[in-house]
From Swiss-Prot:
It comes from Saccharomyces cerevisiae (strain ATCC 204508 / S288c) (Baker's yeast). Pfam families: CAF20 (PF17052). Transmembrane segments: none annotated. It is found in: Cytoplasm. It comes from the Eukaryota. Residues 52-108 are annotated as: Disordered. This is Cap-associated protein CAF20. Acts as an inhibitor of cap-dependent translation. Competes with eIF4G1/TIF4631 and EAP1 for binding to eIF4E/TIF45 and interferes with the formation of the eIF4F complex, inhibiting translation and stabilizing mRNA. Binding affinity for eIF4E/TIF45 is 10-fold less than that of eIF4G1/TIF4631. Required for induction of pseudohyphal growth in response to nitrogen limitation, probably by regulating STE12 translation. Interacts with TIF45.
Amino acid sequence: MIKYTIDELFQLKPSLTLEVNFDAVEFRAIIEKVKQLQHLKEEEFNSHHVGHFGRRRSSHHHGRPKIKHNKPKVTTDSDGWCTFEAKKKGSGEDDEEETETTPTSTVPVATIAQETLKVKPNNKNISSNRPADTRDIVADKPILGFNAFAALESEDEDDEA
């Protein structure tokens, strides 16, 4: 097989014909060998760099991918109040084993306080199908209205007398 230097490759023209003794079979074998080596290198790289679900990072931001976390569990009771349930750290079996190994004494057991978060209820849960009692309704308009003309007339009458 003929080997060329970089300068010789730049001087070659694509329109030139191949040499008479060019061996295409050997050339194809070299190409297949290079393809196999590249495939093995990719497999080795992928086996060591499996992080972030095997995705490659894009080159325009050079940052780590953002991994979405599961939403916290929120329960809504019959009154419409939503309560956040914090994730318990550790398993309950470990706590039971620790209490069994300690001797029975008057040592207070530390408990983990569960944090709760109260949220305003939805307006749809507040509405009612029952009509409101008329005695509970506060009137917006005043019962006794003020008439300015009547007040002016009454002042005039007081002055005349």
